[in-house]
Amino acid sequence: MEWDGILAGIDSGRYDIAANGIDVTEQRSEKYNFSTPYAFNRTALVVRGDNEDIKSFEDLKGKKTTNSIASTYMILAEEYGAEVVGVDTLDQTIMQVLTGRADATLNSEVSIADYMQKRPDANIKIVALTEEANLVAIPTRKTDDSASLLEAINQAIAELREEGKLSEISMKYFGRDITAETVGEAAE
């Protein structure tokens, strides 16, 4: 499923929840109830390896970025004055940057680190990270029926956190613990 269809599925009643690294935002909180955050993730600003013009989010003004459609990254790029081109996948955003069709992309620090680990020869670099981490949680519909579901999700997250399983899974797949509010520290 394409990214922009995930939340639409909740809106239409097709899904009760969505679990796909979804950031909690003020706008989304108006439409959905969110679980307790299970991860904390900063936004990475990524450019081609030879780009020396963009060093900070402020440098995006007047530049072209490529971002996942309807993502928090697209909104953030627009807030910094970038011209935004929407695509469906992370691979597409990186390809746009590599081919020079876009100057930069914004995405999850964890997703970019994973991409770079799997493709160490990719000619990209992270030039900036947001200071604040985004809260990552599971959205549910705002209905009376979803209250018990949200309670069960929160209980499961609490149990996994207390047992150390959330941290263990994070270390296994991301090489760092993104389940704690202190993010960005690589595994030793």
Predicted features and spans:
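Ligand-binding cleft/hinge of the Venus flytrap
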Residues: 35, 70-90, 94, 116-120
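Ligand-binding clefts/hinges and TM-proximal coupling segments of bilobed small-molecule sensing domains
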Residues: 75-85, 124-126, 157-188
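A ligand-binding cleft/hinge motif common to bilobed small-molecule-binding domains
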Residues: 21-30, 76-79, 103-133
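Periplasmic-binding protein-like
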Residues: 40-47, 113-154, 176-188
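Short helix-initiation/N-cap motifs at beta->coil->alpha
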Residues: 1-8, 52, 70, 85-99, ...
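Beta->alpha turn/N-cap motifs
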Residues: 1-4, 13-25, 48, 68-72, ...
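Short loop->beta-strand "edge-of-pocket" segments that line small-molecule binding or catalytic clefts
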Residues: 57-70
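Acidic, polar ligand-binding/catalytic clefts
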Residues: 1-59
